[in-house]
UniProtKB/Swiss-Prot annotation:
<feature type="binding site">
    <location>
        <begin position="184"/>
        <end position="191"/>
    </location>
    <ligand>
        <name>GTP 2</name>
    </ligand>
</feature>
<comment type="subunit">
    <text>Associates with the 50S ribosomal subunit.</text>
</comment>
<comment type="similarity">
    <text>Belongs to the TRAFAC class TrmE-Era-EngA-EngB-Septin-like GTPase superfamily. EngA (Der) GTPase family.</text>
</comment>
<dbReference type="GO" id="GO:0043022">
    <property type="term" value="F:ribosome binding"/>
</dbReference>
<dbReference type="Pfam" id="PF01926">
    <property type="entry name" value="MMR_HSR1"/>
</dbReference>
<feature type="binding site">
    <location>
        <begin position="296"/>
        <end position="299"/>
    </location>
    <ligand>
        <name>GTP 2</name>
    </ligand>
</feature>
<dbReference type="InterPro" id="IPR005225">
    <property type="entry name" value="Small_GTP-bd"/>
</dbReference>
<keyword id="KW-0547">Nucleotide-binding</keyword>
<dbReference type="InterPro" id="IPR016484">
    <property type="entry name" value="GTPase_Der"/>
</dbReference>
<feature type="binding site">
    <location>
        <begin position="231"/>
        <end position="235"/>
    </location>
    <ligand>
        <name>GTP 2</name>
    </ligand>
</feature>
<dbReference type="InterPro" id="IPR015946">
    <property type="entry name" value="KH_dom-like_a/b"/>
</dbReference>
<dbReference type="Pfam" id="PF14714">
    <property type="entry name" value="KH_dom-like"/>
</dbReference>
<dbReference type="InterPro" id="IPR031166">
    <property type="entry name" value="G_ENGA"/>
</dbReference>
<dbReference type="GO" id="GO:0005525">
    <property type="term" value="F:GTP binding"/>
</dbReference>
<keyword id="KW-0342">GTP-binding</keyword>
<dbReference type="InterPro" id="IPR003593">
    <property type="entry name" value="AAA+_ATPase"/>
</dbReference>
<keyword id="KW-0690">Ribosome biogenesis</keyword>
Amino acid sequence: MARPVVAIIGRPNVGKSTLVNRLCRSREAIVHDQPGVTRDRTYQDGYWGDREFKVVDTGGLVFDDDSEFLPEIREQAALALDEASVALVIVDGKQGLTAADESIAEFLRQQRCPTLLAVNKCESVEQGLAMAAEFWSLGLGEPYPISAIHGAGTAEVLDQVLTFLPPKDQEGDEEEPIQMSIIGRPNVGKSSLLNAICGEQRAIVSPIRGTTRDTIDTNIVRENRPWRLVDTAGIRRRRSVNYGPEYFGINRSFKAIERSDVCVLVIDALDGVTEQDQRLAGRIEEDGRACVVVVNKWDAVEKDSHTMSATEKELRAKLYFLDWAPMLFTSALTGQRVESIFALAALAVEQHRRRVTTSVVNEVLKEALSWRSPPTTRGGRQGKLYYGTQVASRPPSFTLFVNDPKLFGDTYRRYVERHIREGLGFDGTPLKLFWRGKQQRDAEKELARQQNRRG
């Protein structure tokens, strides 16, 4: 059984994301003075006592205005309540009871989810009790004074949260999910792709650039395997981004790449590969992440029987440093080939984690040398490749022992990597090759001897 869910509900700027960061001991949720920073529902792992649960942060609820994503935010909040064991309702003690709080209370009474009421921004016990008193009128039960910033009162609220969670023995052991991040420029269809994969309105979709500001985690199961899908904020050039919610969202996106098992790089079929797409591809390769390139909006392209192969050739020419990544042409709008993403991503993750024996590595290297000898300098010095071994996975990394790394230029190094791929596979993952010379090995041995003597 999946971990129970605790939904955080309230109007804009009452401190919901600050409380989420407090409960989850992180700074994943974006906190900013500007109201409406959180739009989609975002999930994090929460812990209290011996219990684990999911905390879902929702956008600020507004019921007297239907502009700028507000209806969609309400829909996202309702979906969060449908799956939650309890809703933790946050109000602002400093500002006091408002008509917006009363509208939210009325909305919650129409839901089946139990509620707990927390009065935030109560920085002292005496002050907090006085501030909380007026919120009894909401009819949501006892108001608990808390300070999300300083942590005061949160222990009492969490103790109450645990009383609403199902018994611990109903929760089974969870297999660690494969983490798949959906990466791309603004408005290439990342959120639409996530919704198509999940079969629900998981993320707010809009033609307005920058609709997704935070990273959105979604846990699903495909082919009996758990996946954690991460929809990220669209990444623009840094000089095009003002300091604020979008800036923090982009930083979260880069962090999502770092903690992913596999990245889905989404390209707009109508725009082709842009300079920013190339930068993102370079970041994925640099961070050593497995990758699948998804060309979205394929339904909008006029095509014949040769269009796909011609387009793939054109795209790969600009994404040459991801030549190892599989490419899939999809339409989030129609659902075309969307499910195929999982098969390609699972294969890429498998290859990313794969290890091969030293004997197999050296069989491939021996064959590479037989087809093409290492280069010789004008002075008559020739590179010698003695042997190689895999030293790490995630990504697969190999150390090649040679007489002098300087004798092996980029062209021959690319040849060796290509031959390793042809002989061993590793589709969907970058490879790291480390070239170690005799002088470097001798120096390391001498250092080890000296350290042993001192010991």
